[in-house]
Amino acid sequence: LQLSDIADISELDSIFVSNVTISDTSGANLVFSCDLSGNQSKKTDDSSSCSSRSSDTDNESDDDEDDDEADGSSDDSGGSEDTDYSTASEDILIATINQFPVQVIAMEKCQDTLDSLIVESEEDLRDAEWGSMIIQVIMTLLAYQKCFSFTHNDLHTNNIMYIPTEKQYLYYKWDGKHYKVPTFGRLYKIIDFGRAIYKFRGNVVCSDSYHPKGDAATQYNFEPYFNDKKPRLEPNTSFDLCRLGCSLYDFVIDEIEENPKSPQNAAKRLIIEWCKDDKDRNILYKNNGDERYPDFKLYKMIARSVHKHSPSDVLNQGYFSRYIVGKKKIGKNAKIMNIDNLPDYS
């Protein structure tokens, strides 16, 4: 089943609700109550921890402060907690709700992450294998962008997984050209869309990670979390490949420095290029080896200063001409993933 095979998606209209009606709960029985005023969330700052190969941007210092406050409030309250809420522990009430809305994320079972593949492989990946991974990821991003004006916003080596396949080749059509891509036994998948931003039928779908108190606050500046005191900053289609390049940089840079012009490092040279900003500076490291933008500031600066690495621009580079074939050279029974014909749902 392909996205283009789905002609009627009218049932998805119910996802977006313009007028929300809150049911009358005046006659409901109170089962349990708790004063949460002493445990309000605190705003996270820009000093969040952020590894280039992960998206751990939780603010540890805020956690410490919350712990201290929790300890202090416990001392001040004395034994009031036991007396105020004793009925909650003594009288256990069970409510059976036959119909209750839930959110479910269903994921395909994959073999492992790209990070593990690179780190744990007994032999280094050949350049052609790097190229296969790169073009599969690019084609996936192109499909998402074509259908949903999509940006992932957290694409690193632990958010790409793969499954084994017996298919020797994948066939794509993009911008009128056909591509024949060797798989080397792996189909690569993008996962973890928690920070993704996309459009569906005129609606912008944006997670609360970008809320002023979210872990990705200030990466962009647009609705629904627009701050009119700062310049508008829309989602950046060059962000994903640059972010992926930053997570791959340390894996490939040694070989590039040893053999900068070797044909065996052609795909790796592409990855190094993705790590350059609009002024051709390495966005990850300074010349002295220090991080240019530590922690979450890397995300913010990629969004603001990198605009040359959108998937469509990258695919037009000479490296990918090796995959282009005439349609007549593709077997009649081959399944072509025609990105040109995918519908625009945005």
Functional labels for PLM-detected ranges:
Residues 1-128, 200-207:
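Conserved structural core of kinase catalytic domains
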Residues 30, 220-346:
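Helical subdomain adjoining the active site within ATP-dependent kinase catalytic cores
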Residues 109, 113, 129-139, 143, ...:
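Acidic, Ser/Thr-rich intrinsically disordered and amphipathic helical segments
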Residues 113-116, 163, 169-170, 196-200, ...:
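Eukaryotic short linear interaction motifs
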Residues 118-122, 156, 174, 201-206, ...:
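Short coil/turn segments at secondary-structure boundaries
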Residues 122-152, 166:
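Conserved kinase catalytic-core helix
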Residues 145-181:
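Catalytic-loop of the protein kinase fold
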Residues 166, 187-196:
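Activation of the activation-loop gatekeeper triad in protein kinase-fold domains
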